[in-house]
Amino acid sequence: MKTINFITGNKNKLAEVQAILGDTIEVQNRAIDVPEIQGSIEEIAKEKCRKAAETVQGPALTEDTALEFNALKGLPGPYIKWFLEALGHDGLNKLLDPYEDKSIVAVCTFAFSSGPGAEPIIFQGKTEGRMVPARGLAKFGWDPIFEYEGNTFAEMDKDEKNLISHRYKALAKLKQWLAETYP
């Protein structure tokens, strides 16, 4: 079985990736700090992956998550980590207070590079939901405020979330590509 270096310091992301890809490829974790540029989701993902492949001198997989508020024309997008850190769950809800439209889209973008100098390939998944006041255990980012069909991600068990999440959808595409192209 081939091995891939998943570049993350987030143990929750690592567990999800290993659970979904584990039967296709061995996922090793490399917790290195890769600087992120500002730009579109795709630009950020590709540049992060290029730098990761150079750093590990081998195959690299990186992930970037965005949360797009439709009422705010896609903001905060790829900057959700910083918005969440600064505002918290309540503050993010307050951003949408003036708007009727509480719809949001979770976007997960994985980028894979076979090594230094190789152009990264993008695999993206999206899940539509709506912003709600925080419910459930706050173990993983904005899960308590992202509602999908009546439950927040934080209220779902891991297996249920892994079947419908933006991350799962992106990983399903990556998994298929790995099986067909990178055996």
UniProtKB/Swiss-Prot annotation:
The keyword Transmembrane does not apply. NCBIfam families: RdgB/HAM1 family non-canonical purine NTP pyrophosphatase. The lineage of its organism: Eukaryota, Fungi, Dikarya, Ascomycota, Pezizomycotina. One of its GO terms (cellular component) is cytoplasm. One of its GO terms (biological process) is nucleotide metabolic process. Homodimer. It comes from Ajellomyces capsulatus (strain G186AR / H82 / ATCC MYA-2454 / RMSCC 2432) (Darling's disease fungus). Belongs to the HAM1 NTPase family. This is Inosine triphosphate pyrophosphatase. Its EC number is 3.6.1.66. It is found in: Cytoplasm; Nucleus. Binds 1 divalent metal cation per subunit; can use either Mg(2+) or Mn(2+). Mg(2+) binds at residue 36. Keywords: Cytoplasm, Hydrolase, Magnesium, Manganese, Metal-binding, Nucleotide metabolism, Nucleotide-binding, Nucleus. InterPro entries: ITPase, ITPase-like_fam, RdgB/HAM1. GO terms for molecular function: dITP diphosphatase activity; ITP diphosphatase activity; metal ion binding; nucleotide binding; XTP diphosphatase activity. It is an enzyme of class 3 (hydrolase). It catalyses: ITP + H2O = IMP + diphosphate + H(+); dITP + H2O = dIMP + diphosphate + H(+); XTP + H2O = XMP + diphosphate + H(+). CDD domains: HAM1. The keyword Cell inner membrane does not apply. ITP binds at residues 8-13, 48, 64-65, 81, 140-143, 161, 166-167. Pyrophosphatase that hydrolyzes non-canonical purine nucleotides such as inosine triphosphate (ITP), deoxyinosine triphosphate (dITP) or xanthosine 5'-triphosphate (XTP) to their respective monophosphate derivatives. The enzyme does not distinguish between the deoxy- and ribose forms. Probably excludes non-canonical purines from RNA and DNA precursor pools, thus preventing their incorporation into RNA and DNA and avoiding chromosomal lesions.
